[in-house]
UniProtKB/Swiss-Prot annotation:
GO terms of biological process kind: L-proline biosynthetic process
Gene3D superfamilies: Aldehyde Dehydrogenase, Chain A, domain 1, Aldehyde Dehydrogenase, Chain A, domain 2
Organism lineage: Bacteria, Pseudomonadati, Pseudomonadota, Gammaproteobacteria, Pseudomonadales
Pathway this chain belongs to: Amino-acid biosynthesis; L-proline biosynthesis; L-glutamate 5-semialdehyde from L-glutamate: step 2/2
Domain of life: Bacteria
Keyword S-adenosyl-L-methionine carried by entry: no
Primary localization class, coarse: cytoplasm
Source organism: Pseudomonas putida (strain ATCC 47054 / DSM 6125 / CFBP 8728 / NCIMB 11950 / KT2440)
Protein name: Gamma-glutamyl phosphate reductase
GO MF annotation list: glutamate-5-semialdehyde dehydrogenase activity; NADP binding
Signal peptide: none
HAMAP family: ProA
């Protein structure tokens, strides 16, 4: 009899829970060996990876997948290099598991501190980007967690090929294959099952469009680490170095349109708008970026009218909304009202203004004179990131190794008894 999706996912969950106990006590050397061996396997399987990815790209083009999504799906030689480098970098990172901090003596004579431990089993649900398979697997493995990966159907061939390489690395290190499992079925029922197994799964990390993440947040029976949108802003202040501002804003938008850290709205102080916008617009138009602006913007440059919906939109495309604001306070008000609490940056040479922006903008990352596309685990020194959280509980911002662990209290005594002594 054919196995049902629920039975299949239950089998994966049970295997992951058992594997989590093995990887949770694995040594740092053993985990690093698995990561290095997986990197070697990827390097040796470039032709297979490219062939599998081409199957996904061909299917995506045939189904009318948008250019930005096709870009996310593509495994170019440079991106394969990046995955290999990413595995080796994660192997070189300090292992957070078992680290003890804040040990102190209490009046009773006991010592109290905190120890980092794995979360257990992490379910990752993502769309389009096959490199997420490597990012997620490497971070979960190094942090001592088992993981169940459910990629989008559009990347099924790529994900299977990548998973094969990871399995080779695990085997070489003597670790069970169930430490990293890829959901083989494209049936959407698998997602519902994965987010409804608290007995097997400790946390879910969704990476994808708003619809996916809203559904996961609404229906999950286990905790979720997430962000809904990447509506990122750059504010060019009256104290900005305009040469710096032109370069930073251009990079923030055009580095890669399809990433959540791409700038979607450019805010410009009215004091510099007439000097800043014409050259900025020239660069964007030359690059093929469609500009949508407020009335004050349209009085200075050629741009389509920006609607209320534009300020709420994560384009993930070559489209940029521009607003001229009265000053710093209005810029902060705009960001906190329309933004997604992801990443926002100010271009300014005024330290007091920069401090106010960083203190009052309610986002996971706030930046000074920096493109928003730097919101990335590698750039922050975390290694690969599992995702970016805009929530305020457990983890906020790019989630790396430490964000995939939790703390438990460690108490050391020498036979002390409660109710005796100074307490």
């Amino acid at each position: 009899m054919t196995e049902s999706v629920l039975d299949y996912m239950t089998r994966l969950g049970r295997a992951a829970r058992e594997a989590s106990r093995v990887i949770g006590r694995a040594s740092t050397a053993q985990k690093n060996r698995a990561l290095q061996a997986a990197a070697d396997a990827l390097d040796a399987a470039r032709a297979e990876l490219t062939a599998a990815n081409e199957l996904d790209l061909a299917a995506g083009r045939a189904s009318g997948l948008e250019p930005a999504l096709l870009d996310r799906l593509a495994l170019t030689p440079a991106r394969i290099d990046g995955m290999i480098t990413g595995l080796r970098q994660v192997a070189s990172l300090p292992d957070p598991v078992g680290a003890i901090r804040d040990m102190s003596y209490r009046p009773s004579g006991i010592q109290v501190g905190k120890m980092r431990t794995p979360l257990g089993v992490i379910g990752i649900i993502y769309e389009s980007r096959p490199n997420v398979t490597i990012d997620a697997a490497s971070l979960c493995l190094k942090s001592g967690n088992a993981t169940i990966l459910r990629g989008g159907s559009e990347a099924i061939h790529s994900n299977r090929a990548i998973a094969t390489c990871i399995q080779r690395g695990l085997a070489e290190a003597g670790l069970p294959a169930a430490v990293v499992q890829v959901v083989e079925t494209t049936d959407r029922e698998a997602v519902g099952a994965l987010i409804s197994m608290p007995e097997f799964v400790d946390v879910i990390v969704p990476r994808g469009g708003r619809g996916l993440i809203e559904r996961i947040s609404r229906d999950a029976r286990v905790p979720v680490i997430k962000h809904l949108d990447g509506i990122c802003h750059i504010y060019v202040s009256q104290h900005a170095d305009l040469d710096k501002a032109w370069n930073v804003a251009f990079n923030a938008k055009t580095y890669r349109y399809g990433i959540c850290g791409a700038m979607e709205t450019l805010l410009v102080d009215q004091q510099v708008a007439e000097r800043f916008l014409p050259e900025m617009a020239r660069r964007f138009v030359e690059k093929g970026v469609e500009l949508r602006g407020c009335e004050r913007t349209q009085a200075i440059i050629s741009a389509k009218p920006a609607t209320e919906a534009d300020w709420h939109t994560e384009y993930l495309d070559a489209i940029l909304s521009i607003r001229v604001v009265d000053g710093l306070n209005q810029a902060i008000e705009h960001i906190n009202h329309y933004g997604s609490h992801h990443t926002d940056s100010i271009i300014s040479e005024h330290q007091g203004e920069a401090r106010q922006f960083m203190a009052e903008v309610d986002s996971a990352s706030v930046m000074l004179n920096t493109p928003t596309c730097f919101a990335d685990g590698f750039e922050y020194g975390l290694g690969a990131e599992i995702g970016i959280s805009t929530d305020k509980l457990h983890a906020r911002g790019p989630v790396g190794l430490e964000g995939l662990t939790c703390e438990k209290y460690v108490v050391i005594g020498d036979g002390q008894l409660r109710g005796q002594g100074s307490c």
